[in-house]
From Swiss-Prot:
The lineage of its organism: Bacteria, Pseudomonadati, Pseudomonadota, Gammaproteobacteria, Alteromonadales. Required for insertion of 4Fe-4S clusters for at least IspG. It comes from Idiomarina loihiensis (strain ATCC BAA-735 / DSM 15497 / L2-TR). GO terms for cellular component: cytosol. InterPro entries: FeS_biogenesis (IPR000361), FeS_cluster_insertion (IPR016092), FeS_cluster_insertion_CS (IPR017870), FeS_cluster_insertion_RrpA (IPR023063), HesB-like_dom_sf (IPR035903). This is Iron-sulfur cluster insertion protein ErpA. Homodimer. Belongs to the HesB/IscA family. Binds 1 iron-sulfur cluster per subunit. GO terms for molecular function: 2 iron, 2 sulfur cluster binding; 4 iron, 4 sulfur cluster binding; iron ion binding. One of its GO terms (biological process) is iron-sulfur cluster assembly. Keywords: Iron, Iron-sulfur, Metal-binding.
Amino acid sequence: MSSAAEQAMPIEFTEQAASKVGKLIAEEENPNLKLRVYVTGGGCSGFQYGFTFDEKKNPGDMEIEKNGVTLLVDPMSLQYLMGGVVSYEEGLQGSRFFVDNPNATTTCGCGSSFSV
């Protein structure tokens, strides 16, 4: 069950993603790290998702906290990610963070690029 604050967030950060971020931060032994999701031009569909760890929040960044870890999204990327879900999956082809984006009109086969 989600709290009212979580329901009001324009991007969802799943339990699986937050748990994996927490494990990765523990491995790095740097509690200041936050997961940043961003959108850049490129990929086979026009835009692509990126994930990186960042120690600082930039002016205008949105912060989404879950289970003691923080997801950061810059204002430009946020406009493309509204209503999206940042998750994490492990499978036969490896593990990855990914975005389920309702704004994407097309996505590439690997799911890392999209168009709007």
